[in-house]
């Protein structure tokens, strides 16, 4: 086992010719080489490792460039370069070696060597030799190594859980390197590669020890695609038995590391308890690592966005205290409205009710109804309203419009094809009202869309601690005490092809049809997993794994199993009131050996069969 090599050994192994012998016994402990370039024009970073610790390479291209210099310039550039502390300079095949290199090599006692290969081959051979010669190995007995989504995942800790989850991960299509007897080798400057140290009884077969001490032939059971000889290590998963008093990372900002062969590997501590699907959590950890390598720091993004929302909410509270008002800007942004007049008033105008009107009677001069309404809502104009105005005498229609525009209307919205006359624009402009154009031709479509949006905003709401998911088209709320496994169960359901609406805090409201609709708070699609921290479901699993809102059809409460009551009848006729509407509820008891996600799917399918008349 090597921790260093020497120039002499490199010369012998790579069959290099010695042009000038300096100190051939210089120790090399860095597996890097450097092909000179900037140095040829006199740019010398005299403090760099490249020019003081790495073996340097000069190819035919660089040597030809040097040969074009004047004698004075050669002297200056080469003398300064050769005075630095790099251990050796290797010229490749056919390189032009000027006399100045020989002169200053002798003066500074430098090793000058010649390769009989071209630059690309020389570089490749030296790198390969150094990576092998300088590798450091250590054996780790109770560690397992797998490749999951291309990520090298090292696992330690709770032995029985580790062996069980490895089988499930292999069944899911991932690859095993070793279940124990792991050797970790450091290659390059900071890369770690793991492989199995134990000799196998059958050549090319991989074995996994089960919890009873027997062995499973992974190669026979799952094929050669389920194994690989070695893998670069990226993350460490430590499995721990669940401890109620222990604090497990719930945000993911504080990155932990563990040292192996002098290098640090990022570590996740995953608590193991009944109902948690470890395979899905470990897969998610691997995907999260890849996401971070791509520059996405999900916990930091979550924290930054949360702070922005807190500041915005604080400012909104200071602006209009506890009044339930909707800024006009939100409606404009939601429906992509084009502002025609009144842009200067948009930021200071609020909508106080869900009322959306077409003016009709007001246009013929009947204003009794509009005067009785406490909060005048948004007014919609289409081609029909303007055709009606054209049938009125000119003086009457102008007077009616003037009277109409004296009321406190938050916003007037035109259909995209309304084509208003000039007098209408003049009157609205003088009145100071906000005039916008919607991207719809039918006024009824605008009224319906605005009503749905405004009703959801102004309706009574409630927030529930749980996870809202969509299964088979049904909106299902998972509830239960903290730590029971709601988020982990939802994570496996997402992995099975279902969709997330909201995690942790779900906001419910009644829509115009009377249905209870659930949606996320201000930050949708984030999920909190103990041990991993905050993960971004939309980024990890794609847009098909999420949706913004969903009607609530069923509640499933996760409970720890009560061993004294294990023969109890199922909870088939429970209901829970949400905003005045009874919602079907089932109890799911969590215990070892029960797959919570699969049980949730069965409960939803059972609910579906009941709706179809099956008993």
Curated annotation (Swiss-Prot):
Binding site for ATP: 480-487
InterPro entries given in the database record: HPr(Ser)_kin/Pase, Hpr_kin/Pase_C, Hpr_kin/Pase_Hpr_N, P-loop_NTPase, Ser_kin/Pase_Hpr-like_N_sf
Gene Ontology CC terms: cytosol
Keywords, comma-separated and alphabetical: ATP-binding, Kinase, Multifunctional enzyme, Nucleotide-binding, Repeat, Serine/threonine-protein kinase, Transferase
GO MF term list: ATP binding; phosphorelay sensor kinase activity; protein serine/threonine kinase activity
Broad enzyme group: transferase
GO biological process terms held by the UniProt record: regulation of carbohydrate metabolic process
Pfam families listed in its UniProt record: Hpr_kinase_C, Hpr_kinase_N
Enzyme Commission number(s) from the entry: 2.7.11.-, 2.7.4.-
Catalytic activity line of the entry: [HPr protein]-L-serine + ATP = [HPr protein]-O-phospho-L-serine + ADP + H(+); [HPr protein]-O-phospho-L-serine + phosphate + H(+) = [HPr protein]-L-serine + diphosphate
Purpose: Catalyzes the ATP- as well as the pyrophosphate-dependent phosphorylation of a specific serine residue in HPr, a phosphocarrier protein of the phosphoenolpyruvate-dependent sugar phosphotransferase system (PTS). HprK/P also catalyzes the pyrophosphate-producing, inorganic phosphate-dependent dephosphorylation (phosphorolysis) of seryl-phosphorylated HPr (P-Ser-HPr).
Other comments on record: This protein is composed of two complete HPrK/P domains fused in tandem. This unusual organization may lead to a separation of the two antagonistic activities in F.nucleatum, with the C-terminal copy carrying the kinase and the N-terminal copy carrying the phosphorylase.
Similarity annotation: Belongs to the HPrK/P family.
Protein name stated in the entry: Putative HPr kinase/phosphorylase
Protein source organism: Fusobacterium nucleatum subsp. nucleatum (strain ATCC 25586 / DSM 15643 / BCRC 10681 / CIP 101130 / JCM 8532 / KCTC 2640 / LMG 13131 / VPI 4355)
Lineage: Bacteria, Fusobacteriati, Fusobacteriota, Fusobacteriia, Fusobacteriales
Name of the gene: hprK
């Amino acid at each position: 086992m090597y921790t260093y090599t020497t120039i002499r050994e490199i010369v012998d192994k790579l069959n290099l010719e010695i042009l000038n012998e300096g100190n051939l016994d210089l120790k090399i402990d860095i597996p890097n080489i450097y092909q000179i370039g900037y140095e040829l024009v006199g740019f010398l970073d005299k403090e760099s490792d490249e020019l003081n610790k790495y073996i340097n390479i000069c190819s035919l291209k660089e040597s030809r460039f040097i040969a074009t210099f004047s004698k004075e310039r050669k002297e200056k550039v080469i003398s300064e370069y050769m005075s630095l502390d790099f251990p050796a300079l290797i010229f490749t095949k056919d390189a032009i070696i000027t006399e100045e290199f020989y002169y200053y090599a002798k003066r500074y006692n430098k090793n000058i060597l010649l390769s009989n290969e071209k630059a690309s081959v020389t570089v490749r051979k030296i790198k390969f030799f150094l990576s092998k010669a300088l590798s450091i190995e250590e054996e780790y007995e109770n560690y397992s190594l797998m490749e999951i989504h291309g990520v090298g995942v090292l696992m330690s800790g709770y032995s029985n859980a580790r062996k069980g989850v490895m089988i499930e991960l292999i069944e899911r299509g991932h690859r095993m390197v070793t279940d124990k007897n792991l050797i970790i080798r450091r290659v390059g400057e900071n890369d770690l590669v793991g492989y199995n140290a134990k000799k196998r009884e059958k050549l090319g077969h991989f074995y996994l020890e089960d919890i009873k001490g027997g062995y499973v032939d992974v190669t026979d059971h799952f094929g050669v695609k389920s194994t690989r000889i070695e893998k670069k290590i990226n993350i460490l998963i430590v499995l721990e038995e669940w401890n109620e008093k222990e604090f497990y990372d719930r945000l993911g900002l504080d990155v932990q590391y563990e040292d192996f062969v002098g290098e640090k590997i990022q570590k996740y501590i995953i608590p193991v308890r009944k109902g948690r699907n470890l395979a899905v959590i470990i897969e998610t950890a691997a995907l999260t690592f890849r996401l971070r390598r791509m520059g996405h720091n999900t916990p930091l993004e979550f924290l930054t966005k949360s702070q922005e929302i807190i500041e915005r909410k604080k400012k909104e509270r200071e602006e209009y205290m506890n009044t339930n008002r909707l800024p006009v800007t939100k409606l404009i942004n939601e429906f992509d409205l084009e502002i025609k007049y009144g842009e200067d008033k948009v930021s200071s105008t609020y909508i106080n009710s869900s009322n959306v009107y077409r003016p009709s009677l007001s246009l013929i001069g009947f204003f009794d109804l509009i005067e009785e309404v406490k909060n005048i809502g948004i007014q919609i104009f289409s081609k029909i309203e303007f055709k009606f105005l054209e049938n009125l005498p000119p003086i009457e229609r102008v007077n009616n419009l003037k009277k109409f525009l004296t009321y406190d209307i938050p916003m007037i919205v035109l259909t995209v094809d309304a084509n208003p006359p000039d007098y209408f624009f003049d009157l609205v402009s003088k009145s100071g009202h906000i005039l916008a154009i919607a991207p719809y031709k039918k006024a009824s479509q605008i009224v319906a869309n605005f009503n749905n949006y405004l009703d959801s905003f102004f309706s009574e709401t409630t927030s529930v601690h749980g996870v809202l998911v969509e299964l088979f088209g049904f909106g299902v709320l998972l509830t239960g005490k903290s730590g029971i496994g709601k988020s982990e169960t939802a994570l496996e359901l997402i992995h099975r092809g279902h969709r997330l609406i909201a995690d942790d805090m779900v906001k419910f409201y009644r829509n115009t049809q009377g249905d209870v609709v659930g949606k996320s708070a201000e930050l949708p699609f984030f999920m909190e997993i103990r041990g991993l921290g905050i993960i971004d479901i939309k980024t990890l699993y794609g847009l098909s794994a999420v949706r913004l809102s969903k009607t609530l059809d069923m509640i499933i409460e996760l409970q720890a199993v009560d061993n004294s009551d294990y023969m109890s009848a199922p909870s088939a006729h429970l209901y829970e009131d949400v905003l005045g509407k009874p919602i079907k509820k089932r109890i799911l008891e969590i215990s070892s050996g029960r797959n919570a996600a699969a049980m949730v799917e069965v409960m939803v399918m059972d609910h579906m069969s009941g709706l179809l008349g099956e008993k």
